[in-house]
Amino acid sequence: VETLKADIDEMARLKINAFHWHLTDYPAWRIQCKKYPVLNDPSKRIQGRDVNGTYSYDQIRDLFRYARERHVQIIPEIDMPGHSTYFKNCFGFPMHDPRGVNILEELLEEFCREIPAEMSPYLHIGADEIRIPNGKQFADRMAAKVKSLGRQPIQWAGNNDLPVSGDSYAQLWNDENSVGLPDPARQKNPYFDSTAGYVNSFDPGILVRRNFFRQPCGTARGNNHSLGVIQCLWPDTRVENKKNIPVQSPQWPAMFAMAERSWKGIPEDGSRFAGSLPEKNTEAYQAFSLFEKRMEALAGSRPFPYWRDSFVEWTVFGPVPQDRQEEVRNNLLAGKSPAGLSPVQTRGGNLYFRTRAGAEGLFSKTKPGNTVWAETTFHSPVEGTMHAMVGFDAPARSTRRCSGVPAAGEWSQCGTRIWVNDKEMKNPQTYKLAGQRRYDKHTWNSPANEMPFDNEEFWWARPPVPFQVKAGENRILIEQPYTGEFQSWGVSFIPVKKAGDRWIADPSYYAKPRREKQDDVSPVP
């Protein structure tokens, strides 16, 4: 509860005014239950998943009051009829069984007696990721029950969810493969937008860009139909140390960008800039660059795995199939332009070729078996050591599908190579999990998902890499093969410097100091 209170403090500071509290899921019913104490029996819960963790009604009321004092409305979710393994463990039948439906109504009654409507005017009933024979009847009955208890029901509204009741608000969602925007005209129910992608699915760069450039709810301004944005974080892989959640899933950088865009709105959608930043000197680029600076200044002491990257410049060559790799590599190292390849000029230290689901990137339609080279040139005033955040893939926190931790001396398990001033450089960092944790398939409902992540599985949670540079111009060439669709294909390279106990971006390698406008601008892509 104390962790949640600290999170609510930060949400209030960002003017985020709602907290969607997911109180039940596969492992357990986390709410104190007086009518059916078996729901709080540790032996009925999924073992290894905080089996003793239950919120008392006193704790729940206390958190509601705490949030309300900070102008944050809690939206509790009691997920039904899916995501409820614990329920069948307790009663021997699923929620959508007639006996289960009766029990659910009693549970809703108890919750609403304990948590009054003036404290909790909304109640989310889940209804996602499940197909049952009586789906519409189930959703309608549960929504009507919530309505009769003086609450506004809310349901998830994805492709594999139960039909949304006419009484409910809809919560639209997508995960890694989310493309396009909600169309307000097609939404029968008032709706929340959760289609920007989950915080647990992406790296820091693309999360910030998605939330900053995307048009919330598919409309320039909110209204009584287009209600607002809810950002989702589902660390489905077992978490051992809860303090690692905001380190492994960059919730605060993503929430900064979500708050910025949700409050200001945007006249036109700029989702195309998530995979590749807008050109320099455009209004959209300048607005994003200024936002990065503000975000860096306001990051504070919270876990904040984001380094502004819009200043990094690239020349990109490719993609080419495997049989041309050596030819192109040799040409680039010799300073020649490879035949038949038109270089692409782009910006952003987080450089995306194809995100894991293919939703974004410079080469989002490219298939595995191809390779891309990224070249960046920068200036160092002196010979010495430059540090940079460097990475090439990372798993979603809901599943382990990923190329894994680099082996000793390697940059990735995908054959990544780096040359500094035409001399190949091996990775100077060695990890305790070197060469491990490679999974080319999803690990949901498998023993692998019960193994907690280590921070070193995420490039943004590792220490920066030292590079030896010369005085004057330096060139770094990165070769990045695409080995399989389990891989998030791209390059992250962001020069950083120490500022107190934190590492912050160091743009001095790319530009001379200059006075920059510090006013507050929203982009018009």
Give, region by region, the residue ranges found by the protein language model:
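Short beta-strands within extracellular/lumenal beta-sheet-rich domains
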Residues: T366-H379, W460-V465
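C-terminal active-site-proximal or functional interface alpha/beta core segments in diverse enzymes
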Residues: D128-G205, N211-F213
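Substrate-binding cleft of carbohydrate-active enzyme catalytic domains
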Residues: V1-L149
